[in-house]
Design a protein with these regions (language model features):
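A short pre-motif secondary-structure segment
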Residues: 131-135
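Internal acidic/polar
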Residues: 89-114, 141
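Structural recognition of an alpha-helix C-terminal capping motif at a helix-to-coil junction
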Residues: 31, 45-52, 65-77
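N-terminal module of bacterial RNA polymerase sigma factors
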Residues: 1-28, 122, 144, 148, ...
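DNA-recognition helix of helix-turn-helix
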Residues: 128, 143, 147-173
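Short, charged helix-capping/linker segments at alpha-helix termini
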Residues: 11-20, 30-49, 153, 175-177
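Sigma70-family region 2
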Residues: 11-12, 51-66, 86
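Arg/Lys-rich amphipathic alpha helix in sigma70-family domain 2
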Residues: 59-62, 73-93, 162
Length: 177
């Protein structure tokens, strides 16, 4: 059964269909949220809340985007709310960086490079970080990112360009020293 059929059934109240939708998108949602927050504990809390909100609000899903994009939008909005309410949210610690899941079978060198990038990403404002992650880790188009974040394509492109420039400066600059 395809995603559209599952969505129709879930919106009709079929719990099994909703469970399948969440299972099919869990890994991507968890990975995105971990990259966004760089905190395993915060990620677990956010993903749990996103799944709950998705179940409660499934009838509000219009189908204008993929279900995964909708889940990511919920995660982003919830994270924004957390940042607004709690200015003291802890970002990644070294121990969490080195324990990031290695789900792509990367060798240790690539894993360290990814962790270095994630470390630098977490120093940036969340709008820039999220735009970059959606584009370069998940392959979303500028148009899709703009819809998810509720901003113009120009703003999305600018955020990604800024992030790339900043990462190049930080990562290449640290290799030279």
């Amino acid at each position: 059964m395809g995603e559209k059929e599952l969505l129709v059934k879930a919106q009709e109240g079929n719990k099994h269909a909703m469970n399948i939708l969440l299972q099919n998108n869990y890994k991507a949602l968890f990975g995105f949220t971990l990259k966004m927050t760089a905190s395993m504990h915060l990620t677990e809390d956010i993903v749990q809340e996103v799944c709950l909100r998705a179940v409660i609000n499934i009838k509000k899903f219009k189908g204008n985007s993929q279900f995964q994009s909708w889940l990511i939008s919920i995660a982003i909005n919830y994270y924004k709310d957390l940042l607004r309410k709690n200015k003291n949210i802890e970002y990644v610690g070294q121990e969490e960086l080195y324990n990031l899941p290695n789900d792509n079978g990367e060798n240790i060198f690539n894993k360290l490079q990814v962790q270095e990038v994630l470390q630098e990403l977490n120093k940036l404002p969340y709008e820039k970080r999220i735009s970059f992650i959606l584009k370069h880790y998940y392959g979303y188009t500028y148009e899709e990112i703009s819809k998810i974040l509720g901003c113009s394509q120009g703003t999305t492109k600018s955020r990604i360009f800024y992030t790339i420039s900043n990462l190049k400066k930080k990562l290449i600059g640290s290799e030279v020293q």
